[in-house]
């Protein structure tokens, strides 16, 4: 298959509705994976910019399909409600979708509430300590594996956990360091612990049995990392000081 026939086959597979449906997850802080709602009623974020650029290359329109967290995006993978996404990858998710290149490596750690006496992982991991995580995410699974005594509870949204931490109803929140640093600036007295319990890798992904879509997404992301498209998306979304980390250490 070559030329126009291959291009048509790709569009049929990657954008069956005539638009590229990009699955995104919403949080107030944004970041390399999370997107935000704009005052005008649209969306902003690194995945938003990458999805728009990808649709332009395909010559189709773009439509964003908003979710509360990455676990919901994974659950929707088999339902045919989205065509492309950018989300944290782990072995469990690799059974439910096809992943292309990694474009972000994030360090997962914990933020502790104002007044907490925990200074490191050892003093945090005590019986009776309540740790929140976003439900059904790679970070939540990592925190459950990491903490032997503290109890990890999953919540649907970042907003809900923000409120619980702000009110002192949970002792800590597991998430990526860049997100937690942003949260610490908004909740006086909270602290982000210095250690890292897991490196979370974020990558482009397509539903299972979409080989043409995966090949296109892989080529697109490889080029985006090398030609400045990804850097521009970071810079446009408040991540000017964040280096591109496309490989684990």
Residue ranges and their predicted role:
Residues 7-88, 227:
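Extracytoplasmic small-molecule ligand-binding "clamshell" domains
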Residues 9, 138-153, 192-193, 222-249:
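Ligand-binding clefts/hinges and TM-proximal coupling segments of bilobed small-molecule sensing domains
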Residues 19-26, 41-44, 122-137, 151:
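Short loop->beta-strand "edge-of-pocket" segments that line small-molecule binding or catalytic clefts
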Residues 20-21, 59-61, 78-87, 128-130, ...:
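Alpha-to-beta junction loops
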Residues 48, 63-75, 119, 153-167, ...:
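Short helix-initiation/N-cap motifs at beta->coil->alpha
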Residues 52, 56, 61-125, 191-194:
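Acidic, polar ligand-binding/catalytic clefts
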Residues 71, 88-96, 142, 166-198:
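A ligand-binding cleft/hinge motif common to bilobed small-molecule-binding domains
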Residues 105-114, 177, 181-222, 240-249:
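Periplasmic-binding protein-like
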């Amino acid at each position: 298959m070559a030329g126009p026939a291959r291009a048509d086959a790709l569009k049929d597979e990657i954008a069956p509705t005539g638009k590229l449906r990009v699955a995104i997850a919403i949080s107030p802080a944004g970041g390399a994976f999370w997107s935000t709602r704009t005052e005008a009623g649209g969306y902003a974020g690194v995945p938003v910019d990458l999805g728009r650029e990808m649709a332009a290359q395909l010559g189709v329109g773009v439509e964003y399909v908003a979710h509360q967290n990455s676990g919901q995006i994974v659950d929707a993978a088999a339902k045919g409600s989205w065509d492309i996404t950018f989300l944290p990858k782990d072995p469990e998710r690799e059974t439910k979708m096809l992943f292309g290149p990694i474009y972000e490596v994030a360090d997962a750690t914990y933020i502790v509430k104002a007044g907490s006496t925990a200074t490191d992982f050892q003093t945090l991991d005590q019986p009776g300590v309540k740790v929140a995580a976003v439900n059904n995410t790679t970070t939540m699974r990592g925190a459950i594996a990491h903490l032997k005594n503290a109890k990890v509870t999953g919540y649907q949204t970042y907003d809900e956990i923000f409120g619980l931490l702000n009110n002192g109803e949970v002792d800590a929140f597991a998430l990526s360091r860049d997100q937690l640093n942003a949260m610490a600036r908004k909740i006086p007295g909270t602290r982000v612990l210095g250690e890292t319990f897991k490196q979370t890798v974020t990558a482009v992904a397509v539903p299972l049995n979409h080989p043409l879509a995966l090949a296109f997404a892989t080529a697109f992301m490889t080029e985006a990392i090398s030609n400045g498209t990804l850097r521009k998306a970071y810079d446009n979304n408040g991540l000017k000081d964040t280096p591109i980390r496309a490989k684990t250490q």
